[in-house]
Amino acid sequence: MKHYILFFFGSFLWATYAQELPLLDRLSAIKNGNREFYAIDGYTITNEDLKLPFDEKGFKKAYRKLKINAQDAQPNPRILTDNYVVNRDKEGYVESLYFVKNLANTISLVWFSKLRDREVEVEEALVNLIVENKIPQELFAPVDANSINFAGRKIPMLNDCYFTGINIVQCPYNGEMNWGIYRTLEDAQQAVTDQFVANKQRKMFKPIVEEEVEVLFEEVPTKAKRVVFDIKGVVSALAGMSGGKTLTVYYVAQVVRNRPIACVMSFWNNDNINATTGLPPLLSRVMRLK
């Protein structure tokens, strides 16, 4: 149970990187059954055919299921098919729901969720790529992949490691890692800062150590933020069943192979530690302490 606690993190780097990375170079994707999942610029996105007709009757069912007021749904003329869009502000995050007409004349729902302000141009560009079936198949990672595409470098998966989502890898007792590719380094820094603040505010996580450390992240000299969390409440009880008491997290943002990347690496106090690197095996594959 302890390895189900995930973080998206923050580091504080003072370099700038003004070049924008193109959308498809930032996009990650997987397929699972009849759903597609995407990640880009801090968004988590699902695309699913609702199997409902693109008509009044179909929308009535869709809106009722999703607790949507029909008056809140508005067409977007920049989307390349018939559509309705609903924006919802939730506590701590925002959502955009695009109901689009697909080739079967049924409703496909492209659902965006993001911690921070929505980026309409990113949403519209991705929806149009989906509508026109222009997402390259090579971007879809297999669910049972035996390697990690880490910012353009393939890393063999350790035994017993598995994906729990897009760019989320967990290795019981050997560390866990989450990452995302962003348009600019500044975007990555902003995203990780927002997420770190959100995680720190959770009552179940109490930071007992916070410090900046020098590391080599994918062979690039980098400052990482190292935080040790004391875990409380129900999560503490679940983690304690397997011996976990504290969680050490490294928050990093850096440009790697011309890709601005935000990454979190974490491990429990009773995880396996490499005597040479001082880190669990998974973390040791992408980072070294200086």
Region spans (language model):
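Flexible, glycine-rich surface segments
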Residues: 147-222, 226, 247
